[in-house]
Amino acid sequence: MGKFMKPGKVVMVLAGRYAGRKAVIVKNIDDGTADRPYSHALVSGIDRYPRKVTATMGKKKVAKRSKIKAFVKVFNYNHLMPTRYSVDIPLDKTIVNKDVFRDPALKRKARREAKVKFEERYKTGKNKWFFQKLRF
């Protein structure tokens, strides 16, 4: 069977705090490592989705409603459901990597990087489906 968990692939988080959230694989580790002897992936996703915006709203209200809260986390493949979709959001690999979990300051920086990139993509209007809450 081919490897389908690749960077850029959109996945659904199935378990834990971020269950039901959409995320993008930043780095996949199919064979596991010494500290995590199972296949896992570093993902970055949306914790709080942007709210609905209408034409009658002012600039301030639109700006406030267009905010996104991001997360960066390592998940076991068992807790991710891959979709057929891919998103090419260029996250900086030097900032968003597995080393960020050692230091809270680095983790904040990584979350900030993800947030900025997600908001940038949201404002261009591409991949609209990615920025909408999954209804289930």
From Swiss-Prot:
Keyword set, alphabetical order: Cytoplasm, Endoplasmic reticulum, Ribonucleoprotein, Ribosomal protein
GO BP of this protein: erythrocyte differentiation; translation
Any one GO MF annotation of this record: structural constituent of ribosome
Location (main, coarse): cytoplasm
Superkingdom, natural source: Eukaryota
One Pfam family, short name: KOW
InterPro entries: KOW, Ribosomal_eL27, Ribosomal_eL27_CS, Ribosomal_eL27_KOW, Ribosomal_eL27_sf, Translation_prot_SH3-like_sf
GO CC terms, sorted: cytoplasmic side of rough endoplasmic reticulum membrane; cytosol; large ribosomal subunit
Compartments it resides in: Cytoplasm, Cytosol; Cytoplasm; Rough endoplasmic reticulum
KOW domain segment(s): 5-40
Entry's family note: Belongs to the eukaryotic ribosomal protein eL27 family.
Subunit structure, as described in the record: Component of the large ribosomal subunit.
Role played: Component of the large ribosomal subunit.
Listed name of the protein: Large ribosomal subunit protein eL27
Gene: rpl27
